[in-house]
């Protein structure tokens, strides 16, 4: 874990959609002391642009000497990041947070998992999907042009709200039929919180182990400032991945989050703020 920013070079920029780009960083270079980034699916890094700010991003690509983050264009920080080119440098610290539990099943070797992703939430799930040996994956987006990793993750069921690709609807519309066919033992999800609330309800109804990766405003990433607290849980340390039993106890899940100034607002207001 890197507790202080280490400068790393952008090796590749991947255009995932018109508003989403992935930035691949080399972890071993003449200006970086790090030879590898020890990481488990679901963890995140803090990315620092000098003289601007630092923001958290899920690791969406990972290899022996590289890693990547997937970034949606939202505000001033992400605008600047989208303008960065191959050969430019950014400060990286981490990875931080609790990862997905790949050994959640009683018999992991025969475990069948269902992965439910929505929008840019797929970034938290991409490496997880690549490491799961036996899974069915559902991805949802508003329209076909917003679906991510279609060439990279070839075996996915797709949903779009406008019907432009795959099933017309949202990923949770498919859960009943998928469970009848696949009888999965665990569900992993990341995306819009309303979608994850429905996944939690489904998992409770069918007594299926589930984990969700939550998004909150993360500032220090080490559990000191309390900015990312959700009903007392510091999501940068105790999360961002939480299991169903924990989510059931969180009154704020699906309802409230905190802005950068600490104000508690509705999820809709929180997601509407640009970063």
Where do the model's predicted regions map?
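Ferredoxin-reductase
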Residues: 1-88
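Local cysteine-cluster metal-coordination motifs and their immediate loop/turn environment
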Residues: 124, 193-194, 215-240
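Short, charged beta-turn/beta-strand-edge "cap" motif at the junction between a beta-strand
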Residues: 51-54, 94-99, 254-255
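Beta-strand residues in well-ordered beta-sheet regions across diverse protein folds
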Residues: 24-26, 70, 93, 116, ...
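Short Fe-S-cluster ligation motifs
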Residues: 231-238, 242-275
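FNR/FR-type flavoprotein reductase catalytic core
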Residues: 76-219
């Amino acid at each position: 874990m890197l507790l202080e920013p280490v400068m790393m070079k952008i090796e590749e920029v991947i255009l995932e959609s018109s508003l989403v780009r992935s930035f691949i960083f080399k972890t071993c270079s003449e200006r970086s002391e790090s030879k590898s980034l020890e990481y488990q699916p679901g963890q995140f890094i803090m990315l620092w642009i000098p003289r601007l700010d630092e923001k958290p991003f899920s690791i969406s690509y990972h290899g022996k000497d590289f890693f990547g983050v997937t970034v949606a264009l939202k505000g001033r920080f992400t605008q600047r990041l989208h303008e960065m080119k191959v050969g430019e440098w950014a400060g990286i610290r981490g990875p931080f947070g609790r990862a997905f539990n790949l050994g959640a099943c009683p018999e992991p070797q025969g475990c069948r998992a269902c992965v439910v992703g929505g929008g840019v939430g797929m970034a938290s799930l991409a490496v997880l999907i690549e490491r799961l040996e036996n899974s069915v994956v559902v991805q949802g987006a508003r329209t076909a042009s917003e679906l991510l990793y279609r060439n990279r993750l070839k075996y996915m069921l797709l949903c779009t709200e406008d019907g432009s690709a795959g099933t017309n609807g949202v990923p949770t519309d498919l859960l009943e039929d998928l469970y009848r066919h696949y009888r999965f033992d665990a569900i992993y999800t990341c995306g819009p919180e309303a979608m994850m609330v429905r996944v939690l309800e489904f998992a409770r109804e069918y007594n299926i182990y589930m984990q969700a990766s939550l998004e909150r405003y993360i500032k220090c990433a080490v559990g000191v400032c309390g900015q990312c607290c959700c009903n007392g849980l510091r999501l940068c340390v105790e999360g961002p991945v939480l299991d169903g039993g924990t989510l059931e106890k969180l009154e704020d899940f699906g309802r409230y989050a905190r802005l950068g100034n600490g104000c508690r607002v509705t999820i809709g207001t929180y997601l509407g703020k640009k970063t």
